[in-house]
């Protein structure tokens, strides 16, 4: 029996039931690779949710960036509210890797800002993979980087049970061993505090506090409590406290690692000296010996990840353990937008190694630092037992691996068909486009226009704006949050036309868009390939009046294939609608987003009130500031819960400033 409980307001429709049945059958038959070739708007995520629910195995859903991962995570959480749907992306708000530029003799130290909320979600994912079967982890490509050794992480967990005889001091020692720190003034993630016979622990994997009550040398009660109100949320008989960091090194392994690092250092010094690199040798010796002292004294040093191979006891060149190694053997991989995600997997290793080689050659790191790396593409696929690729335009690599196991999903549950495609000459294209836009504006519909260059997009934006069109330009410098706000404004009718160079990125499945215009469609290249054209045309595939206009003076092979595929799908859809007497219905999609929803907007109004209070903190009494901090903490946790990490970080910074003021005034 499956541990997943799928909840949806609707049943599979169109060719979804067939697709679900085929995918489930092949997974259960042991097929290593399959491809779900699903047209835009056909409900591919719902299909995959049904497959996961029926197969009943832990699943990893891989997305090519963190914004798309957040959207998928929110969708799957709606389908599986009673199961563990986890979010695993890089926990850095900011990351500047260590680097050296030989030409200018410039060394750049690693600088990073870790987002505590994302780190908590990463720990939540690994913890649930050990404790549950009903787990779906939605991850970005960062999941192929090293993540400690699962067996050591599990071995280091501290079991606590009501009635167990254990001295509180022993529990405190164990907590310190797994990298929790004592702070009797303030609780929080990765910290613990003691009040008499009560121990409060802030686990690394959730925002609730664990309260352990002792009676002498016996555990009397274990409870979850609210970190803000102190309210008891749940009483437990037993639980495990997992380490505060994924990288856990037992003391005996640390001693062996230090000896291995010393041996490698001596060998590398001889090599550098033999090559006449005396400055590099001196630099390496000074840096490494300092790191060794830190490891011996506190078990940690800055840049400790560069010694990961020794600390983990791996062989030179062997792949690091990563998130995949935390899954059980029968796990299922789903690669979303595989035509983008699969090539990304190939590129991660090479970029990392070129930077590390320069650091090693110039005496900043030992050669073993190169083994602190992401998985190579072939190493990743060796770990995968079963995989479903999901894309409207899967790549050749995915098609070849899937062989005959390609499942097509063309019919939309709403009956909406693929857009009509027209090819028009470039002469007079701007005036023709203006007339088409004006028609859409009168019908309160929206339009997307894609150009080949940034300059052309800017000029076209100015031209249309001068003629009274409400238009915006989406360019690469806009960050994820601003981008989503612009898309929300387009949906809400604040403007009618969106222009950009690359409109293939996430978040552009907009039901209000009835026109997609592709300028210079006959210029072969990255954004005018067959797959790119199909994807771009598909942006109008959610509207009952969808049309795509390709402005070109000749018919390229890519155009011909893209138009042919779109027309093939359109014929299938029209035939299905006619046979089943279906009238296409407009997609009614609430104007919300995984990152920016109506609830988020209303919460921002409250945020403005809090901003005023923060700005006037100097005028508040000592009794009022803690209350303000409590409100901000609640807002921060709500933001993090909704995957609004940038906003959560802003709350965190304001809380920090208020605490500094509070301490200063004491």
Swiss-Prot record:
PROSITE patterns in alphabetical order: HELICASE_ATP_BIND_1, HELICASE_CTER, UVR
Domain UVR: 626-661
Intracellular or extracellular location(s): Cytoplasm
Swiss-Prot/TrEMBL keywords: ATP-binding, Cytoplasm, DNA damage, DNA excision, DNA repair, Excision nuclease, Helicase, Hydrolase, Nucleotide-binding, SOS response
Positions of the Helicase C-terminal domain: 429-595
SUPFAM superfamilies xref list: C-terminal UvrC-binding domain of UvrB (SSF46600), P-loop containing nucleoside triphosphate hydrolases (SSF52540)
Pfam families the record matches: Helicase_C, ResIII, UVR, UvrB, UvrB_inter
GO CC, one annotated term: excinuclease repair complex
The Helicase ATP-binding domain, residue ranges: 25-176
Binding site for ATP: 38-45
Role of this protein: The UvrABC repair system catalyzes the recognition and processing of DNA lesions. A damage recognition complex composed of 2 UvrA and 2 UvrB subunits scans DNA for abnormalities. Upon binding of the UvrA(2)B(2) complex to a putative damaged site, the DNA wraps around one UvrB monomer. DNA wrap is dependent on ATP binding by UvrB and probably causes local melting of the DNA helix, facilitating insertion of UvrB beta-hairpin between the DNA strands. Then UvrB probes one DNA strand for the presence of a lesion.
Family under the similarity heading: Belongs to the UvrB family.
Stated name of the protein: UvrABC system protein B
Native source species: Synechococcus elongatus (strain ATCC 33912 / PCC 7942 / FACHB-805)
Gene: uvrB
């Amino acid at each position: 029996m499956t541990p997943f409980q799928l909840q949806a307001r609707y049943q599979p429709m169109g060719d979804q039931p067939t697709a679900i049945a085929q995918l489930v059958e092949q997974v259960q038959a042991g097929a290593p690779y399959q491809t779900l070739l699903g047209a835009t708007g056909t409900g591919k995520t719902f299909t995959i949710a049904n497959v996961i629910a029926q197969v009943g195995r832990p699943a990893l859903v891989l997305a090519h960036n963190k914004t798309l991962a957040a959207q998928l995570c929110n969708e799957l959480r709606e389908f599986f509210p009673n199961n563990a749907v986890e979010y695993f992306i890089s926990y850095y708000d900011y990351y500047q890797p260590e680097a050296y530029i030989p030409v200018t003799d410039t060394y750049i130290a690693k600088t990073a800002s870790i987002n505590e909320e994302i780190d908590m979600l990463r720990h939540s994912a690994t913890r649930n993979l050990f404790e549950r079967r009903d787990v779906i982890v939605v991850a970005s490509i960062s999941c192929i980087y090293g993540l400690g050794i699962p067996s050591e992480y599990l071995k280091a967990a501290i079991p606590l049970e009501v009635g167990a005889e254990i001295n509180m001091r022993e529990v405190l020692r164990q907590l310190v061993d797994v990298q929790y720190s004592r702070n009797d003034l303030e609780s929080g993630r990765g910290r613990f505090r003691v009040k008499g016979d009560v121990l409060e622990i802030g686990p690394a994997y959730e925002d609730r506090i664990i309260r352990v009550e002792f009676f002498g040398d016996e555990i009397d009660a274990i409870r979850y409590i609210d970190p803000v109100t102190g309210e008891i949320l749940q009483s437990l008989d037993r639980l495990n406290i997992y380490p505060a960091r994924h990288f856990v090194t037992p003391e005996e392994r640390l001693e062996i690692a230090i000896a291995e690092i010393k041996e490698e250092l001596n060998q590398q010094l001889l090599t550098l000296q033999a090559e006449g690199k005396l400055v590099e040798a001196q630099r390496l010796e000074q840096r490494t010996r300092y790191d060794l002292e830190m490891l011996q004294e506190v078990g940690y040093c800055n840049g400790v990840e560069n010694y990961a191979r020794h600390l983990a006891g791996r062989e030179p060149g062997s792949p690091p353990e990563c998130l995949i190694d935390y899954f059980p053997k029968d796990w299922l991989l789903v690669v979303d937008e595989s035509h983008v995600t699969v090539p990304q997997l190939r590129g991660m290793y090479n970029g990392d190694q070129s930077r590390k080689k320069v650091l090693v050659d110039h005496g900043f790191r030992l050669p073993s630092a190169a083994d602190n790396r992401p998985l190579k593409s072939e190493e990743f696929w060796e770990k995968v037992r079963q995989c479903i690729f999901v894309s409207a335009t899967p790549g050749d690599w995915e098609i070849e691996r899937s062989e005959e196991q390609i499942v097509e999903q063309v019919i939309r549950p709403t009956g909406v068909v693929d857009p009509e495609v027209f090819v028009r000459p470039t002469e007079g294209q701007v005036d023709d486009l203006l007339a088409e836009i004006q028609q859409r504006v009168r019908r309160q519909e929206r339009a997307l226009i894609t150009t080949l260059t940034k300059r052309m997009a800017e000029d076209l934006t100015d031209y249309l704006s001068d003629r009274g069109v409400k238009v915006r330009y989406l360019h690469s410098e806009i960050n994820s949050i601003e981008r989503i706000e612009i898309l929300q404004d387009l949906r809400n009718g604040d403007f009618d036309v969106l222009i950009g160079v690359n409109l293939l990125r996430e978040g552009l499945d907009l039901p209000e868009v009835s026109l997609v215009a592709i300028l210079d469609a006959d210029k072969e290249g990255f954004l005018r390939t067959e797959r790119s054209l199909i994807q771009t045309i598909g942006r109008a595939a959610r509207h009952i009046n969808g049309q795509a206009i390709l402005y070109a003076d000749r018919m390229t092979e890519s155009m011909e294939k893209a138009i042919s595929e779109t027309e093939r799908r359109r014929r299938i859809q029209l035939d299905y609608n006619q046979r089943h007497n279906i009238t296409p219905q407009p997609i009614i999609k609430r104007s919300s987003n995984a990152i920016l929803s109506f609830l988020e907007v209303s919460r921002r109004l409250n945020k403005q009130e809090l901003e005023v209070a923060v700005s006037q903190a100097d005028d508040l009494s000592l009794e009022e500031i803690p209350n303000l901090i409590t409100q901000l903490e609640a807002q921060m946790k709500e933001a993090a819960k909704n995957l609004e990490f940038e906003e959560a970080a802003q709350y965190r910074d304001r809380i920090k400033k208020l605490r500094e003021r509070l301490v200063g005034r004491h």
